[in-house]
């Protein structure tokens, strides 16, 4: 919030205003000049809060402190709204190990940059009726990523693809490591195959 967006001190000129303090004080309905006098005596500012109210509402406060706190809230809100970047990497069921190594190398770089990585295995022909071959590839990838990233939920089938999202591991204090491992057991081949039916039905 800038000074151009609010009326302060001598710029406020109303016959009557409802004047309140920043800590809940109620000064009542007085002239804007009287309200300004109160603010000046306290070494504070008079800020117009609501011009449309009848009478208009003014608050006695430290405007610079108010502006700083407001700008801080806006910055924090923008950080929370920051979109997560997702990088997509396509694989095939017949991919060679050296090609997997190359693609995983890039995936790890993305994860280290705090990006999410979505691996998609292309299912060709009859493979689309049985995603086992695709899951086998994803399992190989998972073992190469497990020290740096966590799989998000289970793999899921999307038409001619079977995909799996990986996200950066949260940085936690050492005392929480044991609890984290207990709450997030590693995926294994059995779990993957059990989840295959769920993956086919999940959208």
From Swiss-Prot:
Keywords: Cytoplasm, Initiation factor, Protein biosynthesis. SUPFAM superfamilies: Translation initiation factor IF3, C-terminal domain (SSF55200), Translation initiation factor IF3, N-terminal domain (SSF54364). The keyword Mitochondrion does not apply. The keyword Cytoplasm applies. GO terms for molecular function: ribosome binding; translation initiation factor activity. IF-3 binds to the 30S ribosomal subunit and shifts the equilibrium between 70S ribosomes and their 50S and 30S subunits in favor of the free subunits, thus enhancing the availability of 30S subunits on which protein synthesis initiation begins. Monomer. PANTHER family: TRANSLATION INITIATION FACTOR IF-3, TRANSLATION INITIATION FACTOR IF-3, MITOCHONDRIAL. NCBIfam families: infC. This is Translation initiation factor IF-3. The gene is infC.
